[in-house]
């Protein structure tokens, strides 16, 4: 998170291929320490739970700032939205560790918020080990468990006519080796099955990452669709959302769309035309 917009999650388009194999391939040891620390918005309702000497005075400051900006009525919405994003970020971080063969493990700062040093709202639980209401134990256990199905996809946004290419893996850290079928299915947001199948009797030795097989699924839609790829084995399940859009040719009409200032743009404006200029940072002089 300290990298801000330059971090892997922010700098690259959404995908599920991230791992740390290049990072651990060198001669120096790599330590995974307090990964993530993805913060959420404070739950102002939590203050009434502090009945002892410790008081959540920092939450009073957060409430004052919301009120001053006319946003107090959105406090619960901010908590829910930031919590859903936090869950996706922890899922990305934890799955990256599990996708790294030979990786020794990962460590979070905590599963619950840490109130002992300023505001560290990094947990999926509050300081009282209670749910914040945006993720269930079942949902979190999909990607953080002794057995975790995994799917490597180069991107999560597609056009109709594209092929969804997936490498299916299983991270298995249970007590013993397993030999199990691995099922998969791609469904729409309303539960309609697009395609499904099974990899029969896969060897899943304990303490490692196992490659199960590859998928190639044609994507054909006539309207935007959010779909879910689900992979399951032995009672363990994981899923990832993808988005598929129809290929539509966009007509600009009488509006010129340009990404840089040039003579053609200047001429169009001098003639009274319309221009949508989406200039990249640093391409215009600071005059």
Where would I find each of the regions flagged by the language model?
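Substrate-binding/catalytic cleft of secreted carbohydrate-active enzymes
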Residues: 1-125
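Beta-strand-rich binding/interaction modules
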Residues: 161-201, 210-218, 224-233
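Aromatic-rich peripheral "rim/lid" segments of glycoside hydrolase catalytic domains that contact
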Residues: 109-173, 182
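A glycine-rich, often tryptophan-bearing local segment used as a flexible ligand/cofactor-contacting loop or short
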Residues: 261-287
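Low-complexity, Pro/Ser/Thr- and charge-rich linker/hinge segments at domain boundaries
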Residues: 243-261
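Short, exposed coil/turn segments at beta-strand boundaries within extracellular/luminal domains
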Residues: 234-239
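Outer-membrane beta-barrel proteins
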Residues: 82, 154-156, 172, 203, ...
């Amino acid at each position: 998170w300290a990298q801000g917009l330059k971090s892997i999650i922010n700098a690259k388009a959404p995908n599920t291929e991230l791992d740390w194999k290049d990072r651990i391939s060198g001669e120096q040891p790599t330590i995974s320490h307090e990964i993530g620390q993805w913060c959420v918005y404070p739950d102002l309702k939590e203050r009434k739970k502090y009945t002892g000497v410790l008081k959540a005075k920092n939450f009073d400051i957060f409430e004052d700032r919301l009120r001053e900006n006319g946003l107090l009525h959105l406090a619960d919405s901010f908590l829910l939205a930031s919590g859903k994003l936090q869950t996706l970020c922890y899922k990305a971080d934890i799955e990256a560790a599990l996708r790294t063969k030979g990786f020794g493990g990962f460590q979070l700062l905590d599963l619950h918020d840490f109130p002992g040093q300023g505001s560290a709202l990094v947990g999926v639980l509050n300081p009282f080990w209670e749910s914040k209401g945006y993720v269930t134990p079942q949902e979190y256990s999909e990607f953080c468990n002794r057995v975790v199905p995994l799917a490597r996809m180069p991107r999560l946004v597609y056009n109709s006519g594209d092929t969804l290419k997936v490498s299916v893996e299983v991270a298995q850290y249970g007590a013993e080796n397993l030999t199990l079928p691995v099922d998969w299915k791609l469904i729409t947001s309303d539960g309609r099955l697009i395609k499904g199948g099974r990899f029969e009797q896969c060897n899943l030795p304990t303490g490692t990452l196992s490659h199960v097989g590859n998928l190639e699924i044609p994507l054909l839609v006539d309207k935007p669709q959010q779909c879910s790829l689900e992979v399951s084995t032995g009672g363990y399940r994981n899923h990832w959302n993808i988005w598929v859009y129809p290929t539509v040719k966009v007509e600009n009409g009488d509006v010129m769309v340009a990404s840089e200032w040039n003579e053609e743009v200047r001429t169009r404006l001098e003639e009274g035309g319309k221009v949508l200029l989406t200039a990249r940072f640093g391409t215009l002089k600071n005059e």
